[in-house]
Amino acid sequence: MTTETGPDSEVKKAQEEAPQQPEAAAAVTTPVTPAGHGHPEANSNEKHPSQQDTRPAEQSLDMEEKDYSEADGLSERTTPSKAQKSPQKIAKKYKSAICRVTLLDASEYECEVEKHGRGQVLFDLVCEHLNLLEKDYFGLTFCDADSQKNWLDPSKEIKKQIRSSPWNFAFTVKFYPPDPAQLTEDITRYYLCLQLRADIITGRLPCSFVTHALLGSYAVQAELGDYDAEEHVGNYVSELRFAPNQTRELEERIMELHKTYRGMTPGEAEIHFLENAKKLSMYGVDLHHAKDSEGIDIMLGVCANGLLIYRDRLRINRFAWPKILKISYKRSNFYIKIRPGEYEQFESTIGFKLPNHRSAKRLWKVCIEHHTFFRLVSPEPPPKGFLVMGSKFRYSGRTQAQTRQASALIDRPAPFFERSSSKRYTMSRSLDGAEFSRPASVSENHDAGPDGDKRDEDGESGGQRSEAEEGEVRTPTKIKELKPEQETTPRHKQEFLDKPEDVLLKHQASINELKRTLKEPNSKLIHRDRDWERERRLPSSPASPSPKGTPEKANERAGLREGSEEKVKPPRPRAPESDTGDEDQDQERDTVFLKDNHLAIERKCSSITVSSTSSLEAEVDFTVIGDYHGSAFEDFSRSLPELDRDKSDSDTEGLLFSRDLNKGAPSQDDESGGIEDSPDRGACSTPDMPQFEPVKTETMTVSSLAIRKKIEPEAVLQTRVSAMDNTQQVDGSASVGREFIATTPSITTETISTTMENSLKSGKGAAAMIPGPQTVATEIRSLSPIIGKDVLTSTYGATAETLSTSTTTHVTKTVKGGFSETRIEKRIIITGDEDVDQDQALALAIKEAKLQHPDMLVTKAVVYRETDPSPEERDKKPQES
């Protein structure tokens, strides 16, 4: 007779071992015995081993699913049938969600992503669909309930970031490369071009009429290819979008430029597009609404070089990354801690008020990401530990340095892709969300101002960008003899003068209009002729030095020859014929660079200016004191008036300036950098002298040119330029020290005095008076903080008298108490045989001043008349003396 003690003892033993060894309990097997009617305990005990067998397997699966209901509540009531379902739960079906991503060409890409997937999974799918390898510059955005743009964090689950039911995203550029030419693949530059075109059309990247036309022409060349007279008939660009307020005039200008780009490949056109777009002031600036400590509405812009502060579309302050010690936010406040300056002992903290807590956190994240991407070699690891002060958020992607290293390893044939149309851009929005409907010339300050500061003000913060650009600046240039036929650009082309100056002057004629202009500092006037002038100095990019990149030079030189051949020229000294070929090549190379650099002008008062006068006889003398940055020479090249620009038939002169400075060391040959248009002097070059910037050529025509340059030990550069009248002969053997100045007696002198001021508080620095007629004053004051810079006072004066106009400009810059005060004083003397219309002259002077300094305020305008003595009185004075 068999007993069941054996099985019972085994079951009891298994029950005792089960709590101590749960894994072993699942492996315990008990023999199957017939149901013992006299032993109910055996039946009850038989259930427990099967229960112990199934529970560990169920719990391990349930832990993966994060579903603890089975393990918690059904310990004693679990049925043996559960053991049959547990193996099937291993093949779990994950829920997926459909994501819709709007690409840069307005097409949509749909894909399925696991609901618990991270943002990096979706981003990789999109980049794989686009065949994009240099993907670190891009990102995905989504809109929250407040319609605010948020960046999708690739390290977090998508479900935890986006709250709305439809998963809609947009593929955009997150980090704008400071030098797009360093991108390896054309497809990456193509998507960057699409992003910039969207920024321009929506108003996030403001630019002038000329820049709209230039960038639009490159976009047309990239999309449509070479101009074909049979295929491209009528207004073939009307369906494309180039500007927020696109006009027929802009489209005609784009078509004119497009016709000159024959032979330029789409890739080259995109490189030219990027080389010009990167110089715009708002390039790569991510704007956020905020208020300052006084409750004034401002915009905080985050870019590659630091944090920018804007008010009324003008940049009022800048904090470079090296000067920022700490970035933080608390509730809806955003704080930055500034490194103490040279004369400061303590750190300072600046706070800004944002609309809400989420906005402050969003801005803080953007700052962290931009600083890490552009400034660090590798990203910082997030802090570890249970208790961590502050946020654990850190940028998790690759930095720019790592991206460039990875891009250098790309080894694949250039991917084929089709460039799509830009017809999708139909909206026009401004920076602050309002309708974007300002004149083209209003954005000139954006075209010139903050961008130059981003590159030049802080060498440490803009190191990565400046290295690439200085590589272009260091291109060796030679100073050759300059002949009138080799001048870079004509003053005007007749076909461009769709709007004559007379139309603009009629609107300025009345005194009431002048008063209203003085009372409205933000009103801007359109001056198309200045735009045409600037546009002919614009670019082809130096990144592609092929002749295709400079399509306008041939037309410009042809127009110059046509204009000069209409007049009867007296004999003048010429250079030897053997040098003309080399001179033409060097002059073209210099001109290419000068045109390209024209967009990089900063709208700020700096230590050196360039005179641009309209005259037959002129003498220009300027002095540079102290050291200055590479782009300082261009700061006022667009800022000095040319009041008789509307007289297209007037003779003008060319001024050629070279910035070859040896700080602290005199030049071995005082005349080594000078040039003189005489047969005895050949081509002069300065190969041994450091070229801070290539030759700056103003667009003028002269019959003869004499230039002398001296470099003095105190780093003082003095250049005197003398232009001869057409009726006067120049002695070919004249030494460099001689000057020829032909003057014409003036009869009536009309003087316009204009004062402009833009400062937070009245400045204390006063401009020294320049010897000459006490007739004028265009006075400009600009107050901006400068940290860690020495006190610098720079003065510039230029006087030119002609039959038409004479302009004197005086600039004094003083740094005091951490603030820079700049005062600009201009005298405009209009001389003529007949009476000058005071209203028209004053209107033109005010308009010119506001166009040149749109960020300044005109506060005073004075007009008075001077009459020269009669010829008899002039004869008596020498006799009496």
UniProtKB/Swiss-Prot annotation:
PROSITE patterns: FERM_1, FERM_2, FERM_3. Keywords: Acetylation, Actin-binding, Cytoplasm, Cytoskeleton, Disease variant, Intellectual disability, Phosphoprotein. Changing P854S: In MRD11; results in a 50% reduction of interaction of 4.1N protein to GRIA1 compared to wild-type. One of its GO terms (cellular component) is cytoskeleton. Residues 483-541 are annotated as: Spectrin--actin-binding. GO terms for biological process: actomyosin structure organization; cortical actin cytoskeleton organization. Residues 97-378 form the FERM domain. Residues 76-87 have a biased composition (Polar residues). CDD domains: FERM_B-lobe, FERM_C_4_1_family, FERM_F1_EPB41L1. Residues 17-35 have a biased composition (Low complexity). Interacts with AGAP2. May function to confer stability and plasticity to neuronal membrane via multiple interactions, including the spectrin-actin-based cytoskeleton, integral membrane channels and membrane-associated guanylate kinases. It is linked to Intellectual developmental disorder, autosomal dominant 11: A disorder characterized by significantly below average general intellectual functioning associated with impairments in adaptive behavior and manifested during the developmental period. This is Band 4.1-like protein 1. It comes from Homo sapiens (Human). The gene is EPB41L1.
